[in-house]
Amino acid sequence: MAKEDLLTLEGVIDEILPDGRFGVMLENGHRIIAYTAGKMRKFRIRSIVGDSVRVEMTPYDLTKGRIVYREKVGGGGPGGVRRRR
């Protein structure tokens, strides 16, 4: 399957499921089960209920998807960015 065949949609996480999966309500009203992409896992990008996300789906199974981007929200909190020593 070529990468051009993927559908990219916007949605909001509405449920956290076991095994690193999430329930995502898409902007078109459909609800899917999505998992976190490998790069997001590698860099420990965490997602919580209410986060806006971008999901890639294959046209062959419109009930499952992969979360490839989490929209940034303002305010990192006090202290700024923490660096590893």
UniProtKB/Swiss-Prot annotation:
Q: Which UniProt keywords apply?
A: Cytoplasm, Initiation factor, Protein biosynthesis, RNA-binding, rRNA-binding
Q: Which InterPro entries match?
A: NA-bd_OB-fold, RNA-binding_domain_S1_IF1, TIF_IF1
PROSITE patterns (UniProt xref): S1_IF1_TYPE
Record-annotated S1-like domain positions = 1-72
| UniProt GO cellular component terms | cytosol
Which cysteine pairs make disulfide bonds? none
**Claim: Nucleotidyltransferase is one of the keywords in the record:** no
Tell me the GO molecular function terms.
ribosome binding; rRNA binding; translation initiation factor activity
Instruction: Please state where this protein is localized.
Output: Cytoplasm
Q: Which Pfam families match?
A: eIF-1a (PF01176)
Family assignment?
Answer: Belongs to the IF-1 family.
The annotated subunit structure for this chain is:
Component of the 30S ribosomal translation pre-initiation complex which assembles on the 30S ribosome in the order IF-2 and IF-3, IF-1 and N-formylmethionyl-tRNA(fMet); mRNA recruitment can occur at any time during PIC assembly.
Q: What is this protein called?
A: Translation initiation factor IF-1 2
